[in-house]
């Protein structure tokens, strides 16, 4: 587990990251989405000890000051392959030595090459003899040979063709299954990420939301106009802001629903009426239900068993409700 509290990072007088509380389960495959320039790469570099000193803000596996061995449990793979000007085998050996690995060297090399469908004849090649695709695969294979506890992958599919992207996905799943390896994958390639994610994170305005950006809305007059206007100005979280926030995010895992014809009289914090199901998508153990509410689109999540029990259909009308703990205000 990596635990983060009160992490703030500025670059050229601009606030890039402001993460109050976040826990990263290092045994899971987590994905980090966000627009270009949102700070995804910076966040990964911080986690790999390459930016600033955040020893008071980040705990790694229970340690605020991890030793070198513990630091090597984290491996960062950059978007573009970085290979030394020596043979591929020498690149493997250098990395394994750097990570203090002295046993099973040949086994690790062969296994990582096999994962990525790479021929052992490439071990004698130098970087200038490799195609860009081969270089990308070799860099990933070298990373996998370390068998780190937690991998940080920065835009791993950025320069890949469709077949190689699929191969990378299968390899990530194999590593996770065989070695209980965790991954934090930063990308804006939704197709690459969707089938991998056990946990979704979204970086927006320096803050990390534990869901994607479908449910982020602009605030107008301290609220949002769905079918009915929802005023959020009385929320404690809203009042905590010195400057009025400009956006609101609603956690899809904390939204519930009921049939619009049978609205109970319970005291819910917020109710959205006349929501119509427009799309259904299945991911791992959850089903995401996308609804249209006037001109707004939002999603909520159900476990697959729950979804089957309720037998929800496209174009069905629902009312949604949620409490203040489901919302997050953003600048």
UniProtKB/Swiss-Prot annotation:
It is an enzyme of class 7 (translocase). Its EC number is 7.3.2.6. Residues 2-230 form the ABC transporter domain. GO terms for cellular component: membrane. GO terms for molecular function: ABC-type tungstate transporter activity; ATP binding; ATP hydrolysis activity. Part of an ABC transporter complex involved in ultra-high affinity tungstate uptake. Probably responsible for energy coupling to the transport system. Belongs to the ABC transporter superfamily. Transmembrane segments: none annotated. Keywords: ATP-binding, Nucleotide-binding, Translocase, Transport. This is Tungstate uptake system ATP-binding protein TupC. PROSITE patterns: ABC_TRANSPORTER_1, ABC_TRANSPORTER_2. It catalyses: tungstate(in) + ATP + H2O = tungstate(out) + ADP + phosphate + H(+). ATP binds at residues 34-41. It comes from Campylobacter jejuni subsp. jejuni serotype O:2 (strain ATCC 700819 / NCTC 11168). The complex is composed of two ATP-binding proteins (TupC), two transmembrane proteins (TupB) and a solute-binding protein (TupA).
